[in-house]
């Protein structure tokens, strides 16, 4: 097959098709905690499209984590609405296998080795529990954990623990992946 140059119309149609599906909408989302005088977040409006890669930047304490926790249903907004038009969950996670969240802290189960920590979501969401060991090992290789499968969390550095958390989030092949500072614990030479 030879090289084919797309016309401007064809190129624009490909872009339009890619971004035609809005997967998340935030309309006037605000959050005020009872312990705070000012809102943590105020009147956030956002559309996230299929295949988007979106980074939320800001200083410490500006509400990035709060926003992500609201998007995945861990906390509710004080006002406004979060919609997931193309997903099976609305304002709360009714089908968590469609969404994965990587927290700032890895939250690994200390009595499980790396392999079992990664496989845990497949055991919880039984529809994916048939996943072959080969696929799990592909994810282990992808995040740079080959050779660490039998290690326990206490034997891992902070960066390696975060890799386990990222692998665990990827194993269900979620439609939406939310990550809260996932690379902060990884050293420069070991980042993906």
Language model features by range: what are they?
Residues 130-148:
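Conserved ABC ATPase "signature" region
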Residues 151-154, 172:
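Conserved signature/switch motifs of ABC ATPase nucleotide-binding domains
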Residues 57-59:
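The feature captures the beta-strand-to-loop junction immediately N-terminal to the Walker
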Residues 166:
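Hydrophobic anchor residue at the start of the ABC signature
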């Amino acid at each position: 097959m030879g090289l084919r140059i797309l016309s401007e119309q064809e190129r624009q149609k490909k872009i339009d098709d890619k971004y035609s599906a809005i997967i998340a909408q935030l309309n006037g989302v605000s959050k005020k905690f009872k312990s705070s005088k000012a809102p943590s977040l105020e009147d956030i409006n956002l559309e996230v499209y299929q295949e988007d890669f979106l980074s939320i930047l800001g200083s410490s304490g500006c509400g990035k984590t709060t926003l992500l926790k609201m998007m995945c249903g861990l906390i509710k907004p004080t006002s406004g609405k979060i919609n997931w038009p193309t997903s099976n969950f609305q304002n709360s996670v009714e089908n968590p296998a469609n969404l994965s969240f990587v927290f700032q802290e890895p939250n690994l189960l200390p009595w499980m080795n790396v392999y079992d920590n990664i496989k845990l979501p497949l055991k919880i969401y039984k529809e994916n529990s048939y996943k072959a060991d080969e696929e799990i090992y592909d994810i282990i290789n992808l995040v740079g954990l080959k050779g660490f499968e039998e290690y326990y969390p206490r034997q891992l550095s902070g960066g390696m623990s975060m890799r386990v958390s990222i692998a665990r989030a990827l194993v269900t092949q979620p439609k939406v992946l939310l990550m809260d500072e996932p690379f902060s614990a990884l050293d420069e030479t070991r980042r993906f």
